[in-house]
Amino acid sequence: MSSSTKNIPKPPPLPCITYQRFQSSTRKPSSLMRLVPKEALETWDKLFKEGSGADTYVETDNKSHFPAHSSVLAAASPVIATLLNQSRDKNGNTYLKIHGVPCEAVYMFIRFLYSSCYEEEEMKKFVLHLLVLSHCYSVPSLKRLCVEILDQGWINKENVIDVLQLARNCDVTRICFVCLSMVIKDFKSVSSTEGWKVMKRSNPLLEQELIEAVIESDSRKQERRRKLEEREVYLQLYEAMEALVHICREGCGTIGPRDKALKGSHTVCKFPACKGLEGALRHFLGCKSRASCSHCKRMWQLLQLHSCICDDSNSCKVSLCWNFKEKMKKLSKKEQSKWRLLVENIIRARNSLGPFSSRSSGLI
């Protein structure tokens, strides 16, 4: 056994440097070029800038043009490959016309097709033009880079509407989401910008869509706030019933069972509702007009609610628990369903706290 283990060759060392470099490079699309040797990038960039052996040219606005290599452009973009074939004249010469965007943006676009190189400041300046070009000519790597730049704080309330319309036309879901979130978050400021006013005149359907999104978001916030308020009420009821069981079973402060030693009014209780419930119980026990007293009615309701939740009314220490249990059977089905629904909501609110919440002690 020992001789066989000696013949096992040692494993090769882990490719730590290469692997870590690959991991870090996958975080941002723009850093993928780090996997390509610097010399290779410089060679392709030099080929673009010098135009040696160029067999076509790119025409921009104002009849400006610069040389390019049709094979490189065709390999980088299937759309450009088709356009070059369609532009071929009788002598076999080709050309590519890109109008409607600044010459500098076209130059950066063609340079990126060669070497994926760019100047960061120039990229930020012409990012919207390059996004359009990357979408129109189907260059996914450039499109990802533009999305990355836009998603890094480039968008503000002044340009968010313009960027949103452009992102919708270029099928950039991520940027559409970012813009929509910004509009919803600061609708008052965004709706007063010049971009909004222009969009309102040129694209009223988009304006209506954004307004509806803002209204829907406000409705969701109000609904969420309402549910949180309801949940808080249910939790307070649960805490009140916990304090009721605690007082009736163990005693607390200055009130409790006769066979239990009371802790005194200066004792700090772990049940938050105990102090308020202690005063309510004292009032309830000494009140002469329980039938008409609003405070006593709430105590009756709390006792009845406890009986709906209590699983063992026969041995329960809470006063009148068994009596309310029997009384519940005589109520109409409609009334019973109301109490049952209230109990379900309280239990659901309590369970939403989780087992480690400080608000749940588990007495009931």
Curated annotation (Swiss-Prot):
InterPro entries tied to this protein: BT1/2/3/4/5 (IPR044513), BTB/POZ_dom (IPR000210), SKP1/BTB/POZ_sf (IPR011333), TAZ_dom_sf (IPR035898), Znf_TAZ (IPR000197)
Segments crossing the lipid bilayer: none
Region: CaM-binding, residue numbers: 333-355
Gene Ontology BP annotations: protein ubiquitination; regulation of DNA-templated transcription; response to cold; response to ethylene; response to hydrogen peroxide; response to salicylic acid; response to salt stress
Regulation: induction: Down-regulated by salicylic acid (SA), ethylene, hydrogen peroxide and cold. Up-regulated by NaCl.
Associated pathway: Protein modification; protein ubiquitination
Span of zinc fingers (TAZ-type): 232-322
GO MF term set: calmodulin binding; zinc ion binding
Keywords tagged on the record: Metal-binding, Ubl conjugation pathway, Zinc, Zinc-finger
Domain BTB: start-end pairs: 54-122
Tissue occurrence: Preferentially expressed in leaves.
Pfam families (alphabetical): BTB, zf-TAZ
Assembly and oligomerization: Interacts with CUL3A.
Protein's job: May act as a substrate-specific adapter of an E3 ubiquitin-protein ligase complex (CUL3-RBX1-BTB) which mediates the ubiquitination and subsequent proteasomal degradation of target proteins. Essential for female and male gametophyte development.
Domain-related comment: The BTB/POZ domain mediates the interaction with some component of ubiquitin ligase complexes.
UniProt name for this protein: BTB/POZ and TAZ domain-containing protein 3
